[in-house]
Amino acid sequence: MGISMWQLLIVLLIIVLLFGTKKLKNIGGDLGGAVKGFKKAMSDGESEEDKEPKKLSQNESRTIEGSVERNDAKTESKHS
């Protein structure tokens, strides 16, 4: 129960009659320009440094400083 070709043509004809071909051409051009601008902004935001993960050299190591506390105290239970 989809839309047939005739229904699509009728809807397209009504849109052309309402807006006119010149206005539809302008809307299409504006929409295309917006998509191009969005794609360009997305590609400009990604630099080569962001694309590749930072690799540590073989001689480079990381030291994490801190202290560890261990609490082994057992609670005393009262027996009645």
Curated annotation (Swiss-Prot):
GO cellular component: TAT protein transport complex
Swiss-Prot/TrEMBL keywords: Cell inner membrane, Cell membrane, Membrane, Protein transport, Translocation, Transmembrane, Transmembrane helix, Transport
Cross-referenced Gene3D superfamilies: 1.20.5.3310
Main location: membrane
UniProt feature coiled coil, ranges: none
Biased composition (Basic and acidic residues): 67-80
TM region(s), chain numbering: 1-21
Protein's UniProt keywords contain Transmembrane: yes
Region: Disordered, residue numbers: 39-80
Record's bilayer topology term: Single-pass membrane protein
GO biological process per UniProt: protein transport by the Tat complex
Molecular function GO terms recorded: protein transmembrane transporter activity
Highest taxon in the source lineage: Bacteria
Protein location: Cell inner membrane
Biological role stated in the UniProt entry: Part of the twin-arginine translocation (Tat) system that transports large folded proteins containing a characteristic twin-arginine motif in their signal peptide across membranes. TatA could form the protein-conducting channel of the Tat system.
Known partners and oligomeric status: The Tat system comprises two distinct complexes: a TatABC complex, containing multiple copies of TatA, TatB and TatC subunits, and a separate TatA complex, containing only TatA subunits. Substrates initially bind to the TatABC complex, which probably triggers association of the separate TatA complex to form the active translocon.
Family assignment from sequence similarity: Belongs to the TatA/E family.
Name by which UniProt lists this protein: Sec-independent protein translocase protein TatA
Record organism: Hahella chejuensis (strain KCTC 2396)
